[in-house]
């Protein structure tokens, strides 16, 4: 039995004594303890070494006091498992080779055996689960098909997604064949993560806002829905969070995937999202990460606004406090500790 199951209870919209909190990228460079581990190795080796991935996954639980751990990994391990070479250089960015630009390129990609190609993530999950010893839940995750598609086709990050959009608009069938292959891998991968001990899954669609509403409904949401439905068919008790960054105008469509929670960016008032979705899913978010550059007093004010905006909980509401995107590397860990402690104390009165 979990000693602290608030995160899972909130996702399932069950009564909680207070609002749980965790933070995207909580295992990361803002923590000196993470930097000490990272100095000894490169980023992908850290992801692929279960002992090290476990150590940095647990750091924010012990050092910051968050209510959930998220396995330390990267969304691009999926692209690598499918056959692209991935290089992540923190100062220079991300490179994938070869970029996928033709049907022949797509045909060369595989839907991998997850145990064989991504076994190191599963090992890290099992090891972390053991080390956590039921203190808090453990989150597994994957990038969404659209976001991984953009990296695959562009061969890295992009400002305008020119190659990805060209494929969409010139060769829509080709785009769908690549998205489908990526989606099959994501589904198999997330199911394996649950078997390895993940208590919840988050799907990150980091580049969701690159698409119009109509295109998002065609090229992104169906694949997210496929994964969510596959998880729900096999593991109905495992909550799924969908974080489609800055898609504030189609929250209802995101909820229609069957997910348990919708992650929000900071560009929408959480009360508006709650009203629109009418408590049919839990909400996660949505403090602007740059608030953590502020004074601790200001951090409390801004966090308090979100708690107040979400408002009083009822028997079918759920809120997981988080940032609207990942914590930035140069932030003061004491400011995150301040946020975590404040949310724990202040949120009780809304429950």
Swiss-Prot record:
<dbReference type="InterPro" id="IPR006361">
    <property type="entry name" value="Uroporphyrinogen_deCO2ase_HemE"/>
</dbReference>
<dbReference type="GO" id="GO:0006782">
    <property type="term" value="P:protoporphyrinogen IX biosynthetic process"/>
</dbReference>
<feature type="binding site">
    <location>
        <begin position="25"/>
        <end position="29"/>
    </location>
    <ligand>
        <name>substrate</name>
    </ligand>
</feature>
<keyword id="KW-0963">Cytoplasm</keyword>
<feature type="binding site">
    <location>
        <position position="74"/>
    </location>
    <ligand>
        <name>substrate</name>
    </ligand>
</feature>
<feature type="site" description="Transition state stabilizer">
    <location>
        <position position="74"/>
    </location>
</feature>
<comment type="pathway">
    <text>Porphyrin-containing compound metabolism; protoporphyrin-IX biosynthesis; coproporphyrinogen-III from 5-aminolevulinate: step 4/4.</text>
</comment>
<comment type="subunit">
    <text>Homodimer.</text>
</comment>
<feature type="binding site">
    <location>
        <position position="325"/>
    </location>
    <ligand>
        <name>substrate</name>
    </ligand>
</feature>
<feature type="binding site">
    <location>
        <position position="206"/>
    </location>
    <ligand>
        <name>substrate</name>
    </ligand>
</feature>
<feature type="binding site">
    <location>
        <position position="151"/>
    </location>
    <ligand>
        <name>substrate</name>
    </ligand>
</feature>
<comment type="similarity">
    <text>Belongs to the uroporphyrinogen decarboxylase family.</text>
</comment>
<dbReference type="Pfam" id="PF01208">
    <property type="entry name" value="URO-D"/>
</dbReference>
<comment type="function">
    <text>Catalyzes the decarboxylation of four acetate groups of uroporphyrinogen-III to yield coproporphyrinogen-III.</text>
</comment>
<keyword id="KW-0210">Decarboxylase</keyword>
<keyword id="KW-0627">Porphyrin biosynthesis</keyword>
<dbReference type="GO" id="GO:0005829">
    <property type="term" value="C:cytosol"/>
</dbReference>
<keyword id="KW-0456">Lyase</keyword>
<dbReference type="InterPro" id="IPR038071">
    <property type="entry name" value="UROD/MetE-like_sf"/>
</dbReference>
<dbReference type="InterPro" id="IPR000257">
    <property type="entry name" value="Uroporphyrinogen_deCOase"/>
</dbReference>
<dbReference type="GO" id="GO:0004853">
    <property type="term" value="F:uroporphyrinogen decarboxylase activity"/>
</dbReference>
<protein>
    <recommendedName>
        <fullName>Uroporphyrinogen decarboxylase</fullName>
        <ecNumber>4.1.1.37</ecNumber>
    </recommendedName>
</protein>
């Amino acid at each position: 039995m979990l000693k602290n199951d608030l995160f899972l209870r909130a996702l399932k919209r069950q009564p909680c004594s207070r609002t749980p909190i965790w933070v995207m990228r909580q295992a990361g460079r803002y923590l000196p303890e993470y930097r000490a581990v990272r100095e000894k190795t490169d980023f992908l080796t850290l992801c692929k070494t279960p002992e090290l991935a476990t150590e940095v996954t647990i750091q924010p639980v012990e050092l910051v006091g968050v209510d959930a751990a998220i396995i330390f990994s990267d969304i691009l391990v999926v692209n690598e498992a499918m056959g692209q070479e991935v290089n992540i250089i923190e100062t220079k960015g991300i490179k994938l080779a070869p970029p996928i630009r033709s049907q022949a390129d797509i045909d060369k990609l595989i839907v991998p055996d997850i145990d064989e190609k991504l076994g190191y993530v599963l090992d890290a999950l099992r090891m972390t689960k053991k080390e956590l010893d039921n203190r808090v839940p453990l989150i597994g995750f994957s990038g969404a098909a659209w976001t991984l598609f953009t990296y695959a086709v562009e061969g890295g990050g992009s400002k305008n997604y020119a190659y990805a959009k060209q494929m969409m608009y010139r060769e829509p069938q080709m785009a769908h064949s690549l998205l489908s292959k990526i989606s099959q891998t994501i589904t198999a991968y997330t199911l394996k993560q649950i078997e390895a001990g993940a208590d919840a899954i988050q799907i990150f669609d980091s580049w969701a806002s690159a698409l119009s509403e109509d295109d998002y409904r065609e090229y992104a949401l169906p694949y997210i829905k496929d994964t969510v439905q596959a998880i729900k068919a096999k593991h109905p008790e495992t909550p799924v969070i969908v974080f489609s960054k800055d898609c504030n105008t189609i929250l209802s469509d995101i909820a229609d995937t069957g997910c348990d929670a919708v992650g929000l960016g900071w560009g929408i008032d959480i009360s508006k999202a709650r009203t629109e979705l009418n408590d049919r899913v839990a909400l996660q978010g949505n403090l602007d990460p740059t608030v953590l550059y502020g004074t601790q007093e200001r951090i409390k004010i801004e966090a308090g606004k979100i708690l107040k905006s979400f408002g009083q909980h009822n028997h079918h509401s759920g809120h997981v406090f988080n940032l609207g995107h990942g914590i930035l590397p140069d932030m003061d860990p004491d400011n995150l500790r301040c946020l975590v402690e404040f949310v724990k104390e202040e949120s009780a009165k809304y429950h």
